Amino acid sequence: IDSWGATLDYPERFDQQGTNDVTGFLSASYGIAELERLFGWQRIRDHAADLAAYAASIIAPALETLQDVPARPHVGMAQPAQPLLRLPDGIVTDGASQRALKNRLSAEADVEAGIMVWRGQGFLRISAHAYNVAADYEQFVERGIPVIASMARSGASHSPAR
């Protein structure tokens, strides 16, 4: 479905707020039902959990080469499809350094990553869904870990945000 502003000239066509379009609300129940019909939600959940476990099994050891503590922290309510991994100390300490790492991973490694900070410690949130494949996480190890390693070596937690 095209945007309500698709027929407008540039730049006006981009002034339309997609949040005012209720198409998502109208179609969500059909999408949910179709995924159940095609694959089944249990199969999707199992795939996501298995894939996230695989991702953690290859990303955690790579992160552990950069730090003296385990990359897998104890969490109260672990989510099978979204494991949390500890980043090396000092890389992400606040919102600015969180955005800096996220931006560097995007610009230099061409990956999008869930980076968060809690009590001055940075974490990587692995997220897996039906559309993800093992190669997504293998590419993160290949391209994303060197960016994190570079930041760990430099000790700099801040870089210019884009």
PLM regions and their residue ranges:
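Pyridoxal 5′-phosphate
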Residues: 1-162
